[in-house]
Curated annotation (Swiss-Prot):
Protein name: Roundabout homolog 1
Keyword Transmembrane helix: yes
Residue stretches spanning the membrane: 898-918
Compositional bias (Acidic residues): 1322-1336, 1642-1651
Family: Belongs to the immunoglobulin superfamily. ROBO family.
GO molecular function: axon guidance receptor activity; identical protein binding; LRR domain binding
Modified residues (Phosphothreonine): 948, 1240
Length: 1651
C-alpha cells in the first residue's frame, strides 16, 4: 500500500520546485489513498521547512501534519433582504487548511475572486454577506451552503447550512372585520397574517396598545381573538399584527362594538292617586345604543289626549279617572334586546253620594227613614250623627233594642216612633282614603191630621158627545181618609139633583137622561175630605137630531196602562224637587207619557197638575215654593186613557233661603268654621310657574263660603316674606292651580276656609318647588383683565344674574374664551358660587372674545356680551383700536364666501360681456367679408336699391333694403345685400334730392341704385376668369327716382295719399317714379301745386285710358296703402316709391323690384343693423357702347317726369320724397285701411292683405329674382301715369343732358345690376376714401362689366335654359321680407345654380348683347293722347339699352325672332310662361312676399310673362288655386299672354282690353278662359318666377290693378314675347311717345326689328 504512493511522491518531488504545482498536487490527491491513510492513522511525513506550505520537502511528510477538520459547522440562517449575514465555518488541520464555500455544488465567488462581490471570505473561514440580494427573478444568495476545508492531506466538508431570505408581505390574507356584540356575549375576531417566511406570528393591539392576553377572558389561537365574556370596556379598535424577522405588518382596523342591553336605572313604581289628579310613572333606562322607551297599558290603550311622555320618558296622565286604573308597562328596547318594567295605577275616588237624605215630615209616632248612599274607591264608610251630638251611628254596629235609631248596611238611617224631640238635622258622612263628604237632612214632626193628604180621584169623567134625549153617565171614583165626599158642578155651578133627568148614584156617578141642548158644558167632580179636595173635569156636548153621534167606546182595562210606582224624591232645592219612578210593565199597556200631580198646604187644598206629557221616568218639578212640604203622585197615560194614580210620595220639604240672607249668628258661624278641618295634599308642580293644590274638608259646613290658598317663597334667601293669597269662592271645589309663580323657587303653601269676614283654621303647610329654566339674563359686570401672576393669563370676573331672572339655582358658570380659530378656543366651568376665573396660556397676538353664561339644572342661560382682549408679545393687553390690523380686516373680508362669490360672478359677467363683444365683432367682420365675397359665392341677381337722404344735415341711408348709394357722402354707405340698415322712423325734412338738373348735374344726395348687373359682375369673380371689360354707362337713363318711396317701400302698402286707390300728393297730383337710377327729365311743374283732385274717387274707363299716354316707369311694390300711411301730414311733399309707378286708373302703384319691396315692413327686421362701408370703384365709360340720350324729349308735358332741372332740384314745390314719419304699419292697421279702401291691386310677391303686404327686413342676399319679372310691370304703369299727367299742361320736359364723364362702377355689394347714374352722378365724384377703396376692385370689375349684358338674358342662357337659370341662380338672390317670405329666403338659399346662365356661351351672348344694345333700332309706335295728339309715351321713347337700366325692354333680344306663342294651362304653383329671356337684364326686384317652402328645381319653375290686366270673365281658378296654396302673393296671372282688364278699373269695356291682348299676342283667346274676378289673388308659394320683360301698355290697354307687382313677374309667355319685342327699342330713335296698337302691327314691327 505504501508503494502505491510512490508514483505520487515522485510526482510531488518533481513538482517541488513550483509551489503552484505543489498546490495543484495537493488538490489532486487520490481520495481513496488519503482516506485510507487517515483511517490507518499513518502520518504523512512533512518537511520541517515552515515555508513549505504543504509540509513536506522533497518526498518526506512531516509527522505533525494532519488533514483538515471542521471545528465549527455553519448553521442555517434566515436573513432579511438587504441585511448582512454571516455563515460561520472553522476548520483546523496542519498545515492550516484553506476554506472554500459551495452553494448547490457550485463554488461561491467571493471578494477574493471578484473585488466587487458582496460576499467576503473572512480569515476565519466564515462567509460574510455585505447584504443579502434577493429579488423576484434573481435570488443569488439563497440556497444551501457547505464549507470545504482543504490541505494537502485532504479536505473536510461541513454540514449543509441553508441561507433563506426572510419574507413578509404587506397584505393580510384575512383582515379582521368589525364585530358588534352585547355585553356578556362572546366576541370573535379572525385574522390571517400575510404570507411570509418564516411564518409570521400574530398578536393583537387594542386602541394602539398591545392587547393584554393575560386576561382569562381573552384567548388568541390560530389568528383568532376570542373574548368569552365581553364587557363594555372591551369596546375599541383592534388591529391584528403579523410579525417575523422582517418586521411587523398591521391589518386594517376592526372595531369591536359592545352593545348594552337595555336596563332600567329607574323603574316605575305603583301609584295611587285620586280622581282628577295627575299620575306620573318614571322610567329611566340605559343601554348602548340608547334604547327607545315606550309605554303601554296592559289591559287597554293609554287614555287619549290625557297622557304625555316627557323627554325623560316619564309617563304623565292628567285628570285621572276610575277607568285609568290598571297596569302600565315601560318598554325599553334597542337593537340588542328589550326590557320591561310595570307598575300599577290605583285611582282613589273620593266618595260621592248616590242618594242623599232629604228632609222629612212625619207625624208623631210614625217611622221615618233617611236614605244615604255613597260610592268611591275604595268603598267609603257611611255613618250618621245628629247635629250637635257626638254620638256616631255606623252601619256595622249591632242594633240596640232600646234604641230607636239604626243604620242599615246600605247606610240608611231609620227612626222609629218619632217623637217631637227628634226634630232637627241629621248628618250623613261618608269617608275613604281619598276624602270624606257630609250631607244632612231635616226631620219635622207634625200632627196626625196635618199629615193626611187630600183625597185622590182614581177615575174621573171623560169627554162625551150625546144626542138630544140621550143619556150620558159621568163616573168619579175617589179615595181618601176619611172617604171623600163627591160633588158635581157644571160650568162652576153645583149640579142640582132635583131635576128628574139628573141622578147621582151612591158611588158618586152622575147620570143625566133625556139630554138637552142646555146640558152641554163642563162637568167637574169634586172629592173632598177635611185635609183637602180633588177635582176632575170633563166636557159634555149635546147635539140635535140628525147629527150622527158616535157612542163612547167601551174601555178595555188591558189597553189602559197600570199605575206607576211610588215616586221617589232624588233631589230637593229651594224651588225644585226631582222625582223618579218606574212604570208597571207587569200589567196593562205600555204608557206613552206621564202626568205628575202635587199637593202642598202652602199652595192650596187640592191636587194640582204640575207636569204633563212627561216622556221619561224622571222629572224635575220647578216653580215650587221654598220651605214648603209637597206630596207628589204620578199617572201613566196612553191613547186609550189614564191609569190609576201611583202611591203618594213621601212628604218633601223644599229648602229654605240661604242663611246669609236671613242674618247669621256670628258665634254659630265661627263655631262651624272652626269645626271644618282642611287636609292639604302634597302640591303638584305643573310647570315652572304653576302649582296645583288639592285639599279635603273633614267637617263640611254650610257656612263655608270658600277657601283661601296662602303661599310664599321659602328658603334662606327669601326669609319670612308675606303670604300671598289666592281665593277660591266655590265651596264645592277642592283643588286649584296657583299661577304666575317664580321659576325654580321653593314655596310653602297652606289653605284656610272663610265665610264673609270670618275665617277658619289653617291647614298644614306643604312645600313645592317650581321647575327650573335656563337663566333668562346673562351674568352682570363681566370684566376681562390681565392676570398679574402669569404673563399669558387673563382674569375674568362677573356678578350673578338678577335674582328674578335666574330661574332656579345657579349651579355653575360657563366661560368661553374664543380665539379667531378653533385651536385657540379655551373653555372653563366653575361652580355657582364662584364669580371669577383665571384663563392661562393665551397666545399672544390672537384676539380673544370672552363670554360668560350662568347655568341651572335646566341648562345654560343667556351669554354675556363678548369682551375682547388681545395680548402682545410681552403679555400686555393691546388697545382696542390696535387689535385688528388692516391686513387682518382685509384677510377677513377676502375669506368671506360672499366676497369670493362676488369676485366669481364679476369675472363671469366680464367674460360674458367680452364673449358677446367678440361675437358681435366677429359677426360684423364676417358680415363685411360676406358683403364683398359672399355675393360672389351665391349666384343671385338681386336688385338692392337703397335710398340715401339727409337728416339733420348729414347723409343717412334709408331704412330700406340695400342698394342705394350716395357716392358723394362717405357716411351714407350703401346697404349691403346681407345686412339691414337701421330704419329711421321720422324723416320730416325734405332733404332728398330726387330731381336732376337739366345740365346733367345732380345734388350730392342724389340716390344711386345698385342693380343686379353689379351682382352679376361680382359673382363672376368666382367664375373661370371670364372677365370682360364692362364699361359703366354714363347716361341714357330717363326715369325719375323718387327717393322717399324707397322708404315707403320699407313700410306696408298703406299710404295716406292713396285716395280711392290712387296715389296723389296733397294737391291731388300723382307723383312719378322709376325703378332704376334714371336720368330724370326736368319736372317743371310743381308737384305740390298740381291740379289733381285728391278727393277724386273713380276708375277711369278704358276709352279714356286709350287716349292717355302711359309713361314708362318701373314699379316695385304696390304702395297705394303704404304711401297713404306716411303721408298723413298734408304738408309733407308727396312721394311714391322710387321703383313704383302710379296707376292712374287703379290708383295703385306697382312694384317691380323685390329688392325694394322686400325691404319694407317691420316683421323680421333686425333693427340697428349697420351697413358696412363698401369701396367705390371706378367704372368704365359706356358712352362708346351706348347711344346718347335723345336731344329733344317727346313733346308732352308728362316728360317732365323724367327730367328735373337743377333749379327745381330743391324747389319746395317739387315733389321731393320725404322719409316716412312712420315706417311701418301694423298688421291691424293695414287690414283696416284695406277694408276702407276696398279692393286694392295686389302686389307681386306680396299678399293684398296687410299681413302679406307688410314686409319684414330679412336678408335677401340669397334670393334671386327672375330676370324679366321685374321690368315689364314697371313699364306697364305708364298708361295711368300718362293719363293723369294730361291734367298738368304747364309741366314741361327738358331734354336730357349729354352723357357725363365716366363714373365709378357700382360697388360690389349690388346684385346683378350696375347702378345707372343720374345726371348729377355724371359730375359728382365719389369721395377719395371710397375711390381708394374702389381702386382695389377696379381691375377685376372692368373685366367683368362687359359680361353683364351677356349674363342678363341671352338666347342661350335665358331661352335655352330659362327655367334652370331662373331657378338656379337668379331666384337665389330674390328676397321677400314679409312674414310669409321667410320660406322664400330658405328656398333661395338652397336653390341650385346648376341652371345658371353663367356659361361660356352666355358670356359670348352677353358681349353680343352689349353690342346689340349699342346700335339697336326699334320701330316706334305713336299713340294719341286725350287731345288727339300722337306722341310717344315716356316709357316707350327710344333710348339706349344701357346695362345700367333695369328696364328689361331695352334688351339685346329685340333683334331676335319672336317665338310663336304657346297656350299654357294655368296650374297653381306651376305657372308656365314662355318668353324671350335671352336679351333682358335681370330685373331689379323679386316678388316681395313670395313664400315658397321649397326651392323649385329648374324643371319645376317656368318662365312666366308679365301679368297684364285680365278680362272680368277670366276663369278665377288661378285665384282659388293660389289661395288654396296659402300664398301671401296676390295677383292675377296672364295665361298665354292674354291681358286682363280690371273690372274695377274699367268695368265697362272689357272687350277692348281683350282685343288689345289678343292683338298684342297675335292670337286671340277666348275671354271666358281668362276672365278673373278683380279680387286679389295669392300666388302659390312655389311660384318664384324668373324675369319677364316689362311691356309698354298703351292707354287702350291699362294695367289691371291686380297686376301691380304680379305683372312684373307673372304673365303668359306670349304676352311677354309681344311686349319684349315691342319694348326693345333704341331710345335714341324714340322721339315721341309711342304706344302699342292692336292688330298684327305688333308682330310686323317686331319682325322688322328682328330683321
Amino acid at each position: 500500500m505504501k508503494w502505491k504512493h510512490v508514483p505520487f511522491l515522485v510526482m510531488i518531488s518533481l513538482l517541488s520546485l513550483s509551489p503552484n504545482h505543489l498546490f495543484l498536487a495537493q488538490l489532486i490527491p487520490d481520495p481513496e489513498d488519503v482516506e485510507r491513510g487517515n483511517d490507518h492513522g499513518t502520518p504523512i511525513p512533512t518537511s520541517d521547512n515552515d515555508d513549505n506550505s504543504l509540509g513536506y520537502t522533497g518526498s518526506r511528510l512531516r509527522q505533525e501534519d494532519f488533514p483538515p477538520r471542521i471545528v465549527e459547522h455553519p448553521s442555517d440562517l434566515i436573513v432579511s433582504k438587504g441585511e448582512p449575514a454571516t455563515l460561520n465555518c472553522k476548520a483546523e488541520g496542519r498545515p492550516t487548511p484553506t476554506i472554500e464555500w459551495y452553494k448547490g455544488g457550485e463554488r461561491v465567488e467571493t471578494d477574493k475572486d471578484d473585488p466587487r462581490s458582496h460576499r467576503m471570505l473572512l480569515p476565519s473561514g466564515s462567509l460574510f454577506f455585505l447584504r443579502i440580494v434577493h429579488g423576484r427573478k434573481s435570488r443569488p444568495d439563497e440556497g444551501v451552503y457547505v464549507c470545504v476545508a482543504r490541505n494537502y492531506l485532504g479536505e473536510a466538508v461541513s454540514h449543509n447550512a441553508s441561507l433563506e431570505v426572510a419574507i413578509l408581505r404587506d397584505d393580510f390574507r384575512q383582515n379582521p372585520s368589525d364585530v358588534m356584540v352585547a355585553v356578556g356575549e362572546p366576541a370573535v375576531m379572525e385574522c390571517q397574517p400575510p404570507r411570509g417566511h418564516p411564518e409570521p406570528t400574530i398578536s393583537w393591539k387594542k386602541d394602539g396598545s398591545p392587547l393584554d392576553d393575560k386576561d382569562e377572558r381573552i384567548t388568541i389561537r390560530g389568528g383568532k381573538l376570542m373574548i368569552t365574556y365581553t364587557r363594555k370596556s372591551d369596546a375599541g379598535k383592534y388591529v391584528c399584527v403579523g410579525t417575523n424577522m422582517v418586521g411587523e405588518r398591521e391589518s386594517e382596523v376592526a372595531e369591536l362594538t359592545v352593545l348594552e342591553r337595555p336596563s332600567f336605572v329607574k323603574r316605575p313604581s305603583n301609584l295611587a292617586v285620586t280622581v282628577d289628579d295627575s299620575a306620573e310613572f318614571k322610567c329611566e333606562a340605559r343601554g348602548d345604543p340608547v334604547p327607545t322607551v315606550r309605554w303601554r297599558k296592559d289591559d287597554g290603550e293609554l287614555p287619549k289626549s290625557r297622557y304625555e311622555i316627557r323627554d325623560d320618558h316619564t309617563l304623565k296622565i292628567r285628570k285621572v279617572t276610575a277607568g285609568d286604573m290598571g297596569s302600565y308597562t315601560c318598554v325599553a328596547e334597542n337593537m340588542v334586546g328589550k326590557a320591561e318594567a310595570s307598575a300599577t295605577l290605583t285611582v282613589q275616588e273620593p266618595p260621592h253620594f248616590v242618594v242623599k237624605p232629604r228632609d222629612q215630615v212625619v207625624a208623631l209616632g210614625r217611622t221615618v227613614t233617611f236614605q244615604c248612599e255613597a260610592t268611591g274607591n275604595p268603598q267609603p264608610a257611611i255613618f250618621w250623627r245628629r247635629e250637635g251630638s257626638q254620638n256616631l251611628l255606623f252601619s256595622y254596629q249591632p242594633p240596640q233594642s232600646s234604641s230607636r235609631f239604626s243604620v242599615s248596611q246600605t247606610g240608611d238611617l231609620t227612626i222609629t216612633n218619632v217623637q217631637r224631640s227628634d226634630v232637627g238635622y241629621y248628618i250623613c258622612q261618608t269617608l275613604n282614603v281619598a276624602g270624606s263628604i257630609i250631607t244632612k237632612a231635616y226631620l219635622e214632626v207634625t200632627d196626625v191630621i196635618a199629615d193626611r193628604p187630600p183625597p185622590v180621584i182614581r177615575q174621573g169623567p171623560v169627554n162625551q158627545t150625546v144626542a138630544v134625549d140621550g143619556t150620558f153617565v159621568l163616573s168619579c171614583v175617589a179615595t181618601g181618609s176619611p172617604v171623600p165626599t163627591i160633588l158635581w158642578r157644571k160650568d162652576g155651578v153645583l149640579v142640582s139633583t132635583q131635576d128628574s133627568r139628573i141622578k147621582q148614584l151612591e158611588n158618586g156617578v152622575l147620570q143625566i137622561r133625556y139630554a138637552k141642548l142646555g146640558d152641554t158644558g163642563r162637568y167637574t167632580c169634586i172629592a173632598s175630605t177635611p185635609s183637602g179636595e180633588a177635582t176632575w173635569s170633563a166636557y159634555i156636548e149635546v147635539q140635535e137630531f140628525g147629527v150622527p153621534v158616535q157612542p163612547p167606546r167601551p174601555t178595555d182595562p188591558n189597553l189602559i196602562p197600570s199605575a206607576p210606582s211610588k215616586p221617589e224624591v232624588t233631589d230637593v232645592s229651594r224651588n225644585t224637587v226631582t222625582l223618579s219612578w218606574q212604570p208597571n210593565l207587569n200589567s196593562g199597556a205600555t204608557p206613552t207619557s206621564y202626568i205628575i200631580e202635587a199637593f202642598s198646604h202652602a199652595s192650596g187644598s187640592s191636587w194640582q197638575t204640575v207636569a204633563e206629557n212627561v216622556k221619561t221616568e224622571t222629572s224635575a218639578i220647578k216653580g215650587l215654593k221654598p220651605n214648603a212640604i209637597y206630596l207628589f203622585l204620578v199617572r201613566a197615560a196612553n191613547a186609550y186613557g189614564i191609569s190609576d194614580p201611583s202611591q203618594i210620595s213621601d212628604p218633601v220639604k223644599t229648602q229654605d233661603v240661604l242663611p246669609t240672607s236671613q242674618g247669621v249668628d256670628h258665634k254659630q258661624v265661627q263655631r262651624e268654621l272652626g269645626n271644618a278641618v282642611l287636609h292639604l295634599h302634597n302640591p303638584t308642580v305643573l310647570s315652572s310657574s304653576s302649582i296645583e293644590v288639592h285639599w279635603t274638608v273633614d267637617q263640611q259646613s254650610q257656612y263655608i263660603q270658600g277657601y283661601k290658598i296662602l303661599y310664599r317663597p321659602s328658603g334662606a334667601n327669601h326669609g319670612e316674606s308675606d303670604w300671598l293669597v289666592f281665593e277660591v269662592r266655590t265651596p264645592a271645589k277642592n283643588s286649584v292651580v296657583i299661577p304666575d309663580l317664580r321659576k325654580g323657587v321653593n314655596y310653602e303653601i297652606k289653605a284656610r276656609p272663610f265665610f264673609n269676614e270670618f275665617q277658619g283654621a289653617d291647614s298644614e303647610i306643604k312645600f313645592a318647588k317650581t321647575l327650573e329654566e335656563a337663566p333668562s339674563a346673562p351674568p352682570q359686570g363681566v370684566t376681562v383683565s390681565k392676570n398679574d401672576g402669569n404673563g399669558t393669563a387673563i382674569l375674568v370676573s362677573w356678578q350673578p344674574p338678577p335674582e328674578d331672572t335666574q330661574n332656579g339655582m345657579v349651579q355653575e358658570y360657563k366661560v368661553w374664551c374664543l380665539g379667531n380659530e378653533t385651536r385657540y378656543h379655551i373653555n372653563k366651568t366653575v361652580d355657582g358660587s364662584t364669580f371669577s376665573v383665571v384663563i392661562p396660556f393665551l397666545v399672544p397676538g390672537i384676539r380673544y372674545s370672552v363670554e360668560v353664561a350662568a347655568s341651572t339644572g335646566a341648562g345654560s342661560g343667556v351669554k354675556s356680551e363678548p369682551q375682547f382682549i388681545q395680548l402682545d408679545a410681552h403679555g400686555n393687553p393691546v388697545s382696542p383700536e390696535d387689535q385688528v390690523s388692516l391686513a387682518q380686516q382685509i384677510s377677513d373680508v377676502v375669506k368671506q364666501p360672499a366676497f369670493i362669490a362676488g369676485i366669481g360672478a364679476a369675472c363671469w359677467i366680464i367674460l360674458m360681456v367680452f364673449s358677446i363683444w367678440l361675437y358681435r365683432h366677429r359677426k360684423k367682420r364676417n358680415g363685411l367679408t360676406s358683403t364683398y365675397a359672399g355675393i360672389r359665392k351665391v349666384p343671385s341677381f338681386t336688385f338692392t336699391p337703397t335710398v340715401t337722404y339727409q337728416r339733420g344735415g348729414e347723409a343717412v341711408s334709408s331704412g330700406g333694403r340695400p342698394g342705394l348709394l350716395n357716392i358723394s357722402e362717405p357716411a351714407a354707405q350703401p346697404w349691403l345685400a346681407d345686412t339691414w340698415p337701421n330704419t329711421g322712423n321720422n324723416h320730416n325734412d325734405c332733404s332728398i334730392s330726387c330731381c336732376t338738373a337739366g345740365n346733367g348735374n345732380s345734388d350730392s344726395n342724389l340716390t344711386t341704385y345698385s342693380r343686379p348687373a353689379d351682382c352679376i359682375a361680382n359673382y363672376n369673380n368666382q367664375l373661370d376668369n371670364k372677365q370682360t371689360n364692362l364699361m359703366l354707362p354714363e347716361s341714357t337713363v330717363y326715369g325719375d327716382v323718387d327717393l322717399s318711396n324707397k322708404i315707403n317701400e320699407m313700410k306696408t302698402f298703406n299710404s295716406p295719399n292713396l285716395k280711392d286707390g290712387r296715389f296723389v300728393n296733397p294737391s291731388g297730383q300723382p307723383t312719378p317714379y322709376a325703378t332704376t337710377q334714371l336720368i330724370q327729365s326736368n319736372l317743371s311743374n310743381n308737384m305740390n301745386n298740381g291740379s289733381g283732385d285728391s278727393g277724386e274717387k273713380h276708375w277711369k274707363p278704358l276709352g279714356q285710358q286709350k287716349q292717355e299716354v302711359a309713361p314708362v316707369q318701373y314699379n316695385i311694390v304696390e304702395q297705394n296703402k303704404l304711401n297713404k300711411d306716411y303721408r298723413a301730414n298734408d304738408t309733407v311733399p308727396p312721394t311714391i316709391p322710387y321703383n313704383q309707378s302710379y296707376d292712374q286708373n287703379t290708383g295703385g302703384s306697382y312694384n317691380s323690384s323685390d329688392r325694394g319691396s322686400s325691404t319694407s315692413g317691420s316683421q323680421g327686421h333686425k333693427k340697428g343693423a349697420r351697413t358696412p362701408k363698401v369701396p367705390k370703384q371706378g367704372g368704365m365709360n359706356w358712352a362708346d357702347l351706348l347711344p346718347p340720350p335723345p336731344a329733344h324729349p317727346p313733346p308732352h308735358s308728362n316728360s317732365e317726369e323724367y327730367n328735373i332741372s337743377v333749379d327745381e332740384s330743391y324747389d319746395q314745390e317739387m315733389p321731393c320724397p320725404v322719409p316716412p314719419a312712420r315706417m311701418y304699419l301694423q298688421q291691424d292697421e293695414l287690414e283696416e285701411e284695406e277694408d276702407e279702401r276696398g279692393p286694392t291691386p295686389p302686389v307681386r310677391g306680396a299678399a293684398s292683405s296687410p299681413a302679406a303686404v307688410s314686409y319684414s327686413h330679412q336678408s335677401t342676399a340669397t334670393l334671386t329674382p327672375s330676370p324679366q319679372e321685374e321690368l315689364q310691370p314697371m313699364l306697364q304703369d305708364c298708361p295711368e301715369e300718362t293719363g293723369h299727367m294730361q291734367h298738368q299742361p304747364d309741366r314741361r320736359r327738358q331734354p336730357v343732358s349729354p352723357p357725363p364723364p365716366p363714373r365709378p362702377i357700382s360697388p360690389p355689394h349690388t346684385y346683378g345690376y350696375i347702378s345707372g347714374p343720374l345726371v348729377s352722378d355724371m359730375d359728382t365724384d365719389a369721395p377719395e376714401e371710397e375711390e381708394d377703396e374702389a381702386d382695389m376692385e377696379v381691375a377685376k370689375m372692368q373685366t367683368r362689366r362687359l359680361l353683364l349684358r351677356g349674363l342678363e338674358q341671352t338666347p342661350a342662357s335665358s331661352v335655352g335654359d330659362l327655367e334652370s337659370s331662373v331657378t338656379g341662380s337668379m331666384i337665389n338672390g330674390w328676397g321677400s321680407a314679409s312674414e310669409e317670405d321667410n320660406i322664400s329666403s330658405g328656398r333661395s338659399s338652397v336653390s341650385s345654380s346648376d341652371g345658371s346662365f353663367f356659361t361660356d356661351a352666355d358670356f359670348a351672348q352677353a358681349v353680343a348683347a352689349a353690342a346689340e344694345y349699342a346700335g339697336l333700332k326699334v320701330a316706334r309706335r305713336q299713340m294719341q293722347d286725350a287731345a288727339g295728339r300722337r306722341h310717344f309715351h315716356a316709357s316707350q321713347c327710344p333710348r339706349p339699352t344701357s346695362p345700367v337700366s333695369t328696364d328689361s325692354n331695352m334688351s339685346a333680344a329685340v333683334m331676335q325672332k319672336t317665338r310663336p306663342a304657346k297656350k299654357l294651362k294655368h296650374q297653381p304653383g306651376h305657372l308656365r310662361r314662355e318668353t324671350y329671356t335671352d336679351d333682358l337684364p335681370p330685373p331689379p326686384v323679386p316678388p316681395p312676399a313670395i313664400k315658397s317652402p321649397t326651392a323649385q328645381s329648374k324643371t319645376q319653375l317656368e318662365v312666366r310673362p308679365v301679368v297684364v290686366p285680365k278680362l272680368p270673365s277670366m276663369d278665377a281658378r288661378t285665384d282659388r288655386s293660389s289661395d288654396r296654396k296659402g300664398s301671401s302673393y296676390k295677383g292675377r296671372e296672364v295665361l298665354d299672354g292674354r291681358q286682363v282688364v280690371d273690372m274695377r278699373t274699367n268695368p265697362g269695356d272689357p272687350r277692348e282690353a281683350q282685343e288689345q291682348q289678343n292683338d298684342g299676342k297675335g292670337r286671340g283667346n277666348k275671354a271666358a278662359k281668362r276672365d278673373l274676378p278683380p279680387a286679389k289673388t295669392h300666388l302659390i308659394q312655389e311660384d318664384i318666377l324668373p324675369y319677364c320683360r316689362p311691356t309698354f301698355p298703351t292707354s287702350n290697354n291699362p294695367r289691371d290693378p291686380s297686376s301691380s307687382s304680379s305683372m312684373s313677374s307673372r304673365g303668359s309667355g306670349s304676352r311677354q314675347r309681344e311686349q319684349a319685342n315691342v319694348g326693345r327699342r333704341n331710345i335714341a330713335e324714340m322721339q315721341v311717345l309711342g304706344g302699342y296698337e292692336r292688330g298684327e302691327d305688333n308682330n310686323e314691327e317686331l319682325e322688322e326689328t328682328e330683321s
